[in-house]
Regions:
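Terminus-proximal functional modules
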Residues: 1-83
Length: 83
């Protein structure tokens, strides 16, 4: 299972999951998925509703991570069961 890295926004309503795309066919570049979602109800009671998925080259995903951190997003661990 691939390792996932999670960010949560400052008001704890949105979540992003960064994960490496191990099924990528490109021989020259590595890619990551960025899944975005909304937190429903109380954080930790239900898994987030994942709404979108992007696939970016790793260096662009790192840029996105840094941009989100600068905007106040924080690293978090999932507090819900794996789904």
């Amino acid at each position: 299972m691939a390792e996932n890295f999670w960010l949560i926004n400052s008001n704890r309503s949105r979540i992003k999951r960064f994960s490496k795309n191990n099924q990528n066919k490109d021989k020259f570049f590595e890619y990551m998925f960025i899944d975005s979602g909304r937190i429903l109800g109380v954080l930790g009671k239900e898994p987030p509703l994942m709404t979108t998925r992007e696939e970016l080259k790793v260096y662009k995903a790192r840029d996105e991570w840094r941009k989100l951190i600068a905007q106040g997003w924080r690293r978090t661990k999932p507090v819900w069961e794996e789904y």
